[in-house]
UniProtKB/Swiss-Prot annotation:
The name this protein goes by in its record: Tachykinin-like peptides receptor 99D
Biological function: Receptor for tachykinin-like peptides.
Stretches with biased composition (Low complexity): 500-519
Keyword Disulfide bond set for record: yes
Record carries keyword Lipoprotein: yes
Recorded topology in the membrane: Multi-pass membrane protein
Residues carrying lipid (S-palmitoyl cysteine): C399
GO cellular-component term (any): membrane
Location within or outside the cell: Cell membrane
Free-text tissue specificity from the UniProt record: During late embryogenesis (stages 11-15), expressed in the brain and in a specific subset of neurons in each neuromere of the developing ventral ganglion. Expressed in the cortex of the adult brain, which contains the neuronal cell bodies.
Cytoplasmic topological domain residue ranges: 124-134, 198-217, 293-324, 385-519
List of glycosylated residues: N3, N19, N22, N61
Regions of compositional bias (Polar residues) in chain numbering: 454-465, 487-499
Source organism phylogeny: Eukaryota, Metazoa, Ecdysozoa, Arthropoda, Hexapoda
């Protein structure tokens, strides 16, 4: 191997910083940025090897994997030898100053813990509580799974890769890590679009049948299937290569190798990345802006003719709360990823920007902001939804500063009253059957509606009012006894304290409700 202190431009093209700033390979800038900052902190010039070894992935890959920008397919060995030879002209210690290691460890470690733990708690709350198993919440579970995947299976390993500049996890996981990154972001974005469409249909066209659980699962399957197909190239183009470094042990790099040429010089890569940025950012943002704008006009801009029942009013308020929460989720997504995409579009048009002295630290901040999007959704759910908030309190009730309290009752069950007795002060409606007769008492002085039913085979009283959901529900038509219907609060307490505790809460609350009704 011929020792050369510098790469020849004729053989290897432009290996300057701007070459790594191409928007089609944004993550390629990250390790170069850290290398430049590292070199500047040691007051030593950055050798060519520091520019040759760089993170290079697709523009929406959610990852930062160290890789080599190879000159051409089949020249891997020559590029590695030339990179190693260039190390003879300077020293490049793959060591980040300790204070920067602490800083980035806090930022990335905190992000991984909050994103993974928070999203898994959201999944647990929905899947273990019957009252939370709604169409929108199932989509939220899908979104949480995708966010938990990228934070635990991709960010964690890439953070180690950033610090040590070595990929010790093997070639298979090099491929799998990039595949998971692309799969997760596609699934997240498509799920957000599905939620916006579901809210649009439910609010704009309320007479259409609501989405069934089977349809919900089918849509989730289509989302993951489409995301898998889009992410498949990651399993094909990524590979690992061992690169010798003078004075240090060999380093293994994980990099993309496109069939028609190296990264930054591949037409296939450019077309693929353009498709990805359209499908996973611009198209979803436009789609969700249109749907939520139409929904917002319907919920906040339209007026109802005539008087509304309290339940109708509360239904509108409930829909507004859900839409507000999802709009915040979409806004956070757009804000987190806008600087990321803007950076690479701008630097592709104006490469000179990449020579600015502050560009390295700026990119690190932009990258962390984009990756941190996965940790904000659980915080938003806990902040804007009382049931998710109660579920989080139950999980962290062992903390001294957490007070569980009582869960707000279901508003849909709280308001079962109807102001329908404007004609006469009192009226009774009696319905007789062979096995059952029911009497409905409606009183204008109270919004409460009491219904007492007696079965023919056995006697069981059911009192339904506008108070909590802890009221009793009658047993089957032929059973005789009665069974208690657990509220959301009781379901959560039963998960943590056992059935005896939930039964005690049910009995006490039911007795209180019955006393209040009869009084």
């Amino acid at each position: 191997m011929e020792n050369r202190s510098d790469f020849e431009a004729d053989d290897y093209g432009d290996i300057s910083w701007s070459n790594w700033s191409n928007w089609s390979t944004p993550a390629g800038v990250l390790f170069s940025a850290m290398s430049s900052v590292l070199s500047a902190s040691n007051h030593t010039p950055l050798p060519d090897f520091g520019q040759e070894l760089a993170l290079s992935t697709s523009s929406f890959n959610h990852s930062q994997t160290l890789s080599t920008d190879l000159p051409a397919v089949g020249d891997v060995e020559d590029a590695a030898e030339d990179a190693a030879a260039s190390m003879e002209t300077g020293s490049f210690a793959f060591v980040v100053p300790w204070w920067r290691q602490v800083l980035w460890s806090i930022l990335f470690g905190g992000m991984v813990i909050v994103a993974t733990g928070g999203n898994l708690i959201v999944v647990w709350i929905v899947m273990t509580t019957k009252r939370m198993r709604t169409v929108t919440n199932y989509f939220i579970v899908n979104l949480s799974i995708a966010d938990a995947m990228v934070s635990s299976l991709n960010v964690t390993f890439n953070y180690y890769y950033m610090l040590d500049s070595d990929w010790p996890f093997g070639e298979f996981y090099c491929k799998l890590s990039q595949f998971i990154a692309m799969l997760s972001i596609c699934a997240s974005v498509f799920t957000l679009m599905a939620i916006s469409i579901d809210r649009y249909v439910a609010i704009i066209r309320p007479l259409q049948p609501r989405m069934s659980k089977r349809c919900n699962l089918a849509i989730a399957a289509v989302i993951w299937l489409a995301s898998t197909l889009i992410s498949c190239p990651m399993m094909i183009i990524y590979r690992t290569e061992e690169v010798p470094v003078r004075g240090l042990s060999n380093r293994t790099v994980c990099y993309p190798e496109w069939p028609d040429g190296p990264t930054n010089h591949s037409t296939m890569e450019s077309l693929y990345n353009i498709l990805i940025i359209i499908l996973t950012y611009f198209l979803p943002i436009v789609s969700m802006t249109v749907t939520y704008s139409r929904v917002g006009i319907e919920l906040w801009g339209s007026k109802t003719i005539g008087e509304c029942t309290p339940r109708q009013v509360e239904n509108v308020r409930s829909k507004r709360r859900v839409v507000k929460m999802m709009i915040v989720v979409v806004l956070i997504f757009a804000i987190c990823w806008l600087p990321f995409h803007s950076y690479f579009i701008i630097t592709s048009c104006y490469p000179a920007i990449t020579e600015a002295p502050f560009i390295q630290e700026l990119y690190l901040a932009i990258y962390w902001l984009a990756m941190s999007n996965s940790m904000y959704n659980p915080i938003i759910y806990c902040w804007m939804n009382s049931r998710f908030r109660y579920g989080f309190k139950m999980v962290f009730r062992w903390c001294l500063f957490v007070r569980v309290g009582t869960e707000p009752f279901s508003r849909r069950e709280n308001l079962t009253s109807r102001y329908s007795c404007s004609g006469s002060p009192d009226h009774n409606r009696i319905k007789r059957n062979d096995t059952q007769k029911s009497i409905l008492y409606t009183c204008p002085s109270s919004p409460k509606s009491h219904r007492i039913s007696h079965s023919g085979t056995g006697r069981s009283a059911t009192l339904r009012n506008s108070l909590p959901a802890e009221s009793l529900s009658s047993g089957g038509s032929g059973g005789g006894g009665h069974r208690k219907r657990l509220s959301y609060q009781q379901e959560m307490q039963q998960r943590w304290s056992g059935p005896n505790s939930a039964t005690a809460v049910t009995n006490s609350s039911s007795t209180a409700n019955t006393t209040q009704l009869l009084s």
